[in-house]
């Protein structure tokens, strides 16, 4: 795997003629994954609103003109009930998100109980709780956490235009703490916040140049929420979004590339192109934290129409190169 990408290389990949880009992405995808399988996760907001951060895209910030109502941390029993329903609906991983800058000790105790309870159902677990230090990641690891989500959101250069209450380096430090604790990393970003080609390339470059590629790479299409600073941001055309998915697949061929927020406004045809470009993971359920997501029956119908099906637990690990394919062949495909 490469960890030495340059911005120029990534910009060149994104800008390839569309048929060539899709060919390279699909070819690499098939070398590591079954292209007919999709990893299914469900995301639940366990603590909504009242966040002290000022992320320009997020309605959970207490600093914006319009914010969602702040709620208390959910009870463990209520979370387990939601996890049971998610498993019944076909999810293999249950993700829990809390609108915190960083969790307090007593809240982390409760989250650890949630992790243990969800794990007992036979589901993988993922949480996103804000910034973590080494001690906090060790506690989560001890509770059995499988994945921790902490997105970079955008390039380091554009980051200051979106967030001022947390530095880019603080995000990287949290990722390092998560990795050092032996927890799988879930890390991606958002397309459509006013960034340019260089910023999109910079985000993918940073992700792919981490010491180890994230096991899961969620790519979000901005959901424009009224009352947030990005509520009237210019929409991104579907082909541009598909190009980012394809480039992420080429640069991080072993990772699960997830279609995250923004799917509610995507057509079936756009979904199909994303899957062809190498996306192999989605969030299932009618809401992602506070924003809408396609209804479960719509996802089932779409996957059925495409001849695709959910991954089983054993298939949901990082991709493994098929024996007939050499590492040199993969690198040549990525850069030629």
UniProtKB/Swiss-Prot annotation:
Binds 1 [4Fe-4S] cluster. The cluster is coordinated with 3 cysteines and an exchangeable S-adenosyl-L-methionine. Binds 1 [2Fe-2S] cluster. The cluster is coordinated with 3 cysteines and 1 arginine. It is an enzyme of class 2 (transferase). Its EC number is 2.8.1.6. Pathway: Cofactor biosynthesis; biotin biosynthesis; biotin from 7,8-diaminononanoate: step 2/2. It comes from the Bacteria. One of its GO terms (biological process) is biotin biosynthetic process. [4Fe-4S] cluster binds at residues 51, 55, 58. [2Fe-2S] cluster binds at residues 95, 126, 186, 258. Keywords: 2Fe-2S, 4Fe-4S, Biotin biosynthesis, Iron, Iron-sulfur, Metal-binding, S-adenosyl-L-methionine, Transferase. InterPro entries: Aldolase_TIM (IPR013785), BATS_dom (IPR010722), Biotin_synth/BioAB (IPR002684), Biotin_synthase (IPR024177), Elp3/MiaA/NifB-like_rSAM (IPR006638), rSAM (IPR007197). It catalyses: (4R,5S)-dethiobiotin + (sulfur carrier)-SH + 2 reduced [2Fe-2S]-[ferredoxin] + 2 S-adenosyl-L-methionine = (sulfur carrier)-H + biotin + 2 5'-deoxyadenosine + 2 L-methionine + 2 oxidized [2Fe-2S]-[ferredoxin]. Residues 36-263 form the Radical SAM core domain. CDD domains: Radical_SAM. Its cofactor is [4Fe-4S] cluster; [2Fe-2S] cluster. GO terms for molecular function: 2 iron, 2 sulfur cluster binding; 4 iron, 4 sulfur cluster binding; biotin synthase activity; iron ion binding. Belongs to the radical SAM superfamily. Biotin synthase family. Homodimer. Catalyzes the conversion of dethiobiotin (DTB) to biotin by the insertion of a sulfur atom into dethiobiotin via a radical-based mechanism. This is Biotin synthase. It comes from Gluconobacter oxydans (strain 621H) (Gluconobacter suboxydans). The gene is bioB.
């Amino acid at each position: 795997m490469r960890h030495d990408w340059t911005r120029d290389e990534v910009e060149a990949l994104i800008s390839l003629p569309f048929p060539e880009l899709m060919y390279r992405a699909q070819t690499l995808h098939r070398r590591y994954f079954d292209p007919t399988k999709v990893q299914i996760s469900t995301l639940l907001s366990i603590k909504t609103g009242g966040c002290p951060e000022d992320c320009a895209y997020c309605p959970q910030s207490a600093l914006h003109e319009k914010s969602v109502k702040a709620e208390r941390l959910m009870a463990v029993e209520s979370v387990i009930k939601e996890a049971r329903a998610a498993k019944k609906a076909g999810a293999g991983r249950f993700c829990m998100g809390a609108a915190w800058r960083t969790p307090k000790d007593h809240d982390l105790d409760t989250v650890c109980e949630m992790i243990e309870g969800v794990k007992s159902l036979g589901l993988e677990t993922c949480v996103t709780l804000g910034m973590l230090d080494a001690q906090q990641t060790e506690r989560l690891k001890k509770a059995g956490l499988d994945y921790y989500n902490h997105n970079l959101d955008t390039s380091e250069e554009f980051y200051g235009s979106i967030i001022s209450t947390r530095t880019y380096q603080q995000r990287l430090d949290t990722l390092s703490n998560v990795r050092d604790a032996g927890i799988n990393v879930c890390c991606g970003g958002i397309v459509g916040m006013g960034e340019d080609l260089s910023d999109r390339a910079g985000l993918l470059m940073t992700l792919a140049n981490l010491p180890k590629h994230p096991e899961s790479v969620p790519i979000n299409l901005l959901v424009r929420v009224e009352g947030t600073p990005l509520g009237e941001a210019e929409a991104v055309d579907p082909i541009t979004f598909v190009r980012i998915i394809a480039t992420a697949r080429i640069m991080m061929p072993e990772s699960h590339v997830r279609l995250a927020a923004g799917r509610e406004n995507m057509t079936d045809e756009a979904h199909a192109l994303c899957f062809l470009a190498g996306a192999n993971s989605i969030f299932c359920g009618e809401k992602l934290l506070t924003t809408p997501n396609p209804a479960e029956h719509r996802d089932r119908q779409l996957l059925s129409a495409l001849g695709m099906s959910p991954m089983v637990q054993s298939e949901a690990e990082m991709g493994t190169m098929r024996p007939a394919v050499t590492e040199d062949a993969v690198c040549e495909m990525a850069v030629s």
